From Swiss-Prot:
<dbReference type="InterPro" id="IPR036821">
    <property type="entry name" value="Peptide_deformylase_sf"/>
</dbReference>
<feature type="binding site">
    <location>
        <position position="178"/>
    </location>
    <ligand>
        <name>Fe cation</name>
    </ligand>
</feature>
<dbReference type="Pfam" id="PF01327">
    <property type="entry name" value="Pep_deformylase"/>
</dbReference>
<feature type="binding site">
    <location>
        <position position="174"/>
    </location>
    <ligand>
        <name>Fe cation</name>
    </ligand>
</feature>
<dbReference type="GO" id="GO:0046872">
    <property type="term" value="F:metal ion binding"/>
</dbReference>
<comment type="function">
    <text>Removes the formyl group from the N-terminal Met of newly synthesized proteins. Requires at least a dipeptide for an efficient rate of reaction. N-terminal L-methionine is a prerequisite for activity but the enzyme has broad specificity at other positions.</text>
</comment>
<feature type="binding site">
    <location>
        <position position="131"/>
    </location>
    <ligand>
        <name>Fe cation</name>
    </ligand>
</feature>
<dbReference type="InterPro" id="IPR023635">
    <property type="entry name" value="Peptide_deformylase"/>
</dbReference>
<dbReference type="GO" id="GO:0042586">
    <property type="term" value="F:peptide deformylase activity"/>
</dbReference>
<keyword id="KW-0378">Hydrolase</keyword>
<keyword id="KW-0408">Iron</keyword>
<dbReference type="GO" id="GO:0043686">
    <property type="term" value="P:co-translational protein modification"/>
</dbReference>
<protein>
    <recommendedName>
        <fullName>Peptide deformylase</fullName>
        <ecNumber>3.5.1.88</ecNumber>
    </recommendedName>
</protein>
<feature type="active site">
    <location>
        <position position="175"/>
    </location>
</feature>
<keyword id="KW-0479">Metal-binding</keyword>
<dbReference type="GO" id="GO:0006412">
    <property type="term" value="P:translation"/>
</dbReference>
<comment type="similarity">
    <text>Belongs to the polypeptide deformylase family.</text>
</comment>
Length: 204
């Protein structure tokens, strides 16, 4: 039984045991493009990946399943070398603690996503990045593009082109790196991890 066959079983909930860790060769491989029209298996896998992210962000389900909270997941992280990513970025509460009008600033499963253009300006998260496949802290600025235009297909086989900036752009670039065999710490300057290039946007 392949990893995907196990993951898409109706009763299976993706948990931390399904997520492979650094050192596994799947994380360093360039993943294969999915074929269209999408197979039921690839659609279900995308839905399961999104379900995992929602569970991971839910305090009750997250604790029950022992999950680390995540805003993105790529198929290679669950040992399926396909170009599928799921992104779920929640909107914050307002200053008075009220829930946002829209729960998420981005909620999408992207098939065969690719960056088709990007800004000259770079950006990095002030606190660095983490990864569900990396069980250690690696400090430093992860240098990425401040703005990107991404093309992808959705589960209905429809093509989209979206422009992203800020945190959403960072998250999508992190996940696209996964399908290209790249891990976030590859983009940290090992000798000067917190060196900010001139004009680089630091996102708090």
């Amino acid at each position: 039984m392949s990893a995907q066959d196990k993951l898409i079983k109706a009763q299976h909930l993706i948990d931390m045991n399904d997520i492979i860790r650094e050192g596994n060769p799947t994380l360093r491989a360039v993943a294969k493009e999915v074929e269209f029209p999408l197979s039921d298996d690839d659609i279900i896998l995308g839905e399961k990946m999104m379900q995992f992210l929602k569970h991971s962000q839910d305090p009750v389900m997250g604790e029950k399943l022992g999950l680390r909270a995540g805003v993105g997941l790529a198929a290679p992280q669950i040992d399926v070398s396909k170009r599928i990513i799921a992104v779920l970025v929640p909107n914050p509460e307002d200053s008075e603690g009220n829930p946002p009008k829209e729960a998420y600033s981005m909620e999408e499963v992207l098939y065969n996503p690719k960056i088709v253009s990007h800004s000259v300006q770079d950006a990095a998260l002030a606190d660095g990045e983490g990864c569900l496949s990396v069980d250690r802290v690696v400090e430093g600025y992860v240098v990425r593009h401040a703005r990107v235009t991404v093309e992808y297909y959705d589960k209905h086989n429809e093509k989209h082109r979206i422009k992203l900036k800020g945190y959403n752009a960072i998250v999508v670039q992190h996940e696209i790196d996964h399908i290209n065999g790249v891990l976030f710490y590859d983009r940290i300057n090992a000798k000067k991890p917190f060196e900010a290039k001139e004009g680089m946007l630091i996102l708090e």
